[in-house]
A protein has these predicted regions:
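A secondary-structure capping/hinge motif
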Residues: 192-198, 241-254
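Hydrophobic side chains within alpha-helical segments
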Residues: 45, 208-211, 238-241
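The DNA-recognition helices of helix-turn-helix-type DNA-binding domains
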Residues: 195-196, 207-210, 246-247, 258-261
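Alpha-helical bundle regulatory/interaction domains
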Residues: 1-175, 179-185, 199, 216-217, ...
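Conserved structured core elements
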Residues: 203-206, 233, 237
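Catalytic-pocket segment enriched in acidic/His residues
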Residues: 190, 198, 202-214, 218, ...
């Protein structure tokens, strides 16, 4: 999706929250897009027109406050008018300690949050309307700080492993991660799945896909064989196969069907942000 302003988390949340972001987009262009699988979990507050989820069971109207958990296929959300939203982008191990809920990517498309969150979403809608996104994000962070970490969680090892996965674009060996956590491979996988509802190997694939997608958006003409080498795929065919398993399209299809990003690529600040955000020094 086409994120606009990005806000850094306050120190209390910095280890478990990647960022906060705000989005405004007209209905037509928003409804052409899809949420591709991503290595983060989005806690979305809709402050604009109603949103509906397209699924195999039909259309489902979404609550104001909901979670987009880890996905393994594209997610289609449609707006009934002008789209306005703000989101907290969580690392997946932080769902339990920050939201006090479980997130299972294999069975749940989105997770509606409880009544307190829905009331808070109504308040944020008014704040955005009258005082803007910056103040709304400040209020969002304050609300999360008051409700997060209510219970004791031993996150240090899994948090460290997760950041190592991100830093390596999903290419670090699972045995090496387990060793750095001073756990056996089976213990490491069990603890990782307890907090993320996904195996570390499966999560590494999503991390790698996210970095690959970002590299293509920054430079759609980059050679796929070069990307395969950078990301540790056995060859170009392997890269395309993996990409299609998450995106339901080829890498070139994605680049050709994302006109908003073609326009954004003319903005040097956006390209610099993407390169730094995903460590894309080779995608220039």
């Amino acid at each position: 999706m086409l994120h606009q302003p990005i806000y850094a988390p306050v120190p209390m949340l910095a280890a478990d929250v990647n960022c906060f972001w705000a989005l405004e987009q007209d209905q037509e262009s928003y409804n052409r897009e899809v949420y591709l699988p991503d290595a983060y979990i989005e806690v979305i507050i809709n402050v604009g027109a109603p949103l509906v989820l397209e699924s195999e069971h039909g259309m489902l109207e979404l609550p104001r406050a909901f979670v987009n958990p880890l996905q393994n296929k594209p997610l289609r959300i449609r707006a009934a008018g002008f789209c306005q939203m703000i989101s907290m982008q969580l690392y997946p191990w932080a769902v339990k300690p920050i939201l006090n809920i479980d997130a299972d990517p294999s069975t749940v498309h989105v997770i509606g949050l409880d009544a307190d969150w829905q009331r808070f979403a109504d308040d944020l809608t008014q704040i955005v309307a009258h005082r803007g996104y910056g103040e709304a994000i400040d209020c969002y962070q304050e609300y999360v700080c008051k409700t997060a970490y209510r219970h004791k969680h031993d996150l240090m090892l899994i948090r460290t492993a997760g950041h190592l996965l991100h830093g390596s674009h999903g290419q670090i060996r699972m045995a090496d991660l387990a060793t750095q956590c001073h756990l056996s491979p089976s213990q490491f996988e069990r603890q990782f799945k307890h907090y993320t509802a996904i195996s570390p190997k499966a999560y590494a694939r999503i991390v790698r896909f996210g970095s690959l997608q970002a590299a293509l958006l920054v430079n759609p003409s980059i050679r796929l064989a070069d990307l395969a080498d950078v990301y540790g795929y056995s060859d170009q065919a392997h890269l395309i196969r993996e990409f299609k398993s998450f995106a339901d399209c080829t890498p070139r299809d994605l680049a050709a069907s994302a006109p908003a990003y073609f326009e954004l690529r003319q903005n040097e600040d956006w390209c610099d942000f993407m390169k730094q955000y995903f460590n894309l020094s080779y995608a220039g």
